[in-house]
Amino acid sequence: MVVFSKVAAAAFGLSAVASAMPAAPPRQGFTINQLTRAIPKRTINLPAIYANALSKYGGNVPPHIQDAMAHGSAVTTPEQYDVEYLTPVAVGGTTMNLDFDTGSADLWVFSNELPSSQTTGHSVYKPSDNGTRMSGYSWEISYGDGSSAGGDVYRDTVTVGGVTAPGQAVEAASHISEQFTRDQNNDGLLGLAFSSINTVQPKSQTTFFDSVKSQLESPLFAVTLKHQAPGSYDFGYIDQSKYTGELTYTDVDNSQGFWMFSATAGETDFDAIADTGTTLIMIDQSIAEDYYSQVPLAFNNFFYGGWTFPCSAELPSFTVTINGYDAVVPGEHIKYAPVTDGSSTCFGGIQDNQGLPFSILGDVFLKSQYVVFDSEGPQLGFAPQA
């Protein structure tokens, strides 16, 4: 009985301490919608979009694509051809329109360290009163079209939806190339790949998602990109109203820092990366050739740097099988854009991966799917959009 009394007393004491402690904040789930607003026309360079995706993954940009960048452009708006999807994010108190990118792990932004001539039309990060510069830390990025950016690193408050990372690494641009300054819709990038590939030197930093996932109901986010319309990101929960049927899950190999998984197209097995920061589907040459063999007058057009076809063509759908689930991309999504403004020749949304050891399933693929990025496993879940 003495032992029982001691245990009871201890239990009572623990319960009293617990009741005196503040309750842990409830875990959250929230949805952040992408922008829907009028955006003026701007010039996009289709071969440059292709080249940037290749160089992002360490691939070589062939000479014919480099040559095509010199004359390949189309005057359009981002919504019309789904070049990029932008999402509002509060960075150090400034609301900025960022590109959410599951193919990289950096959060970089236009900053007040840039000359005013390079920030026209952009929201600019200014460190908050709580923001601190990380002495000796820096970052640098470059892409296949010659664009580049780099600068200093700060710790500051970053808020997406209702969730805040109070000491998030923010990569503030102090120098930036003209290609970025011309895109006045985009104030930077928020990476959602794995923190292991963050490029900050001398020590990589944690992504926003890794910083806040303990605050979420579940350590996941789900992506609903739309064809020629704004989509949404669900953080911490799965919205069953956004897909039909059941989710099919597949294991992720994150050894290279990406959301990589196994898939099949036709009779060909391949590894693929789900990348919201890449516009196109970039796949094995044989798969691209098999697909375009079904499209009259389609060919690998060296002048324009990739597969083209008559804009009047009716394109077949494209199917990627993932752990038994057939993810179907409608042909209209693959008819990406005219090679120049008003042209009757269109640039394909499926292109050759130029020998990369994996394929990239970018927005052309993702905007027909509801995709769950689950850090437990890790794993990916796929279902058709509702």
Curated annotation (Swiss-Prot):
Gene Ontology BP annotations: proteolysis
Protein role: Secreted aspartic endopeptidase that allows assimilation of proteinaceous substrates. The scissile peptide bond is attacked by a nucleophilic water molecule activated by two aspartic residues in the active site. Shows a broad primary substrate specificity. Favors hydrophobic residues at the P1 and P1' positions, but also accepts a lysine residue in the P1 position, leading to the activation of trypsinogen and chymotrypsinogen A.
Peptidase A1 domain: residues covered: 85-383
Glycosylation site positions: 130
Disulfide bonds: 311-346
EC numbers: 3.4.23.18
Gene Ontology MF terms: aspartic-type endopeptidase activity
Complex and partners: Monomer.
A GO cellular-component term linked to this record: extracellular region
Name of the protein in question: Aspergillopepsin-1
Annotated propeptide span(s): 21-69
Signal peptide positions (record): 1-20
Induction record: Expressed, albeit at a very low level.
Assigned protein family: Belongs to the peptidase A1 family.
Alphabetized InterPro entries for the sequence: Aspartic_peptidase_A1 (IPR001461), Aspartic_peptidase_AS (IPR001969), Aspergillopepsin-like_cat_dom (IPR034163), PEPTIDASE_A1 (IPR033121), Peptidase_aspartic_dom_sf (IPR021109)
Location in or out of the cell: Secreted
Top EC category: hydrolase
Main location: secreted
PROSITE patterns listed in its UniProt record: ASP_PROTEASE, PEPTIDASE_A1
Gene name per UniProt: prtB
Catalytic activity: Hydrolysis of proteins with broad specificity. Generally favors hydrophobic residues in P1 and P1', but also accepts Lys in P1, which leads to activation of trypsinogen. Does not clot milk
Record key words, sorted: Aspartyl protease, Disulfide bond, Glycoprotein, Hydrolase, Protease, Secreted, Signal, Zymogen
Catalytic residue list: 101, 275
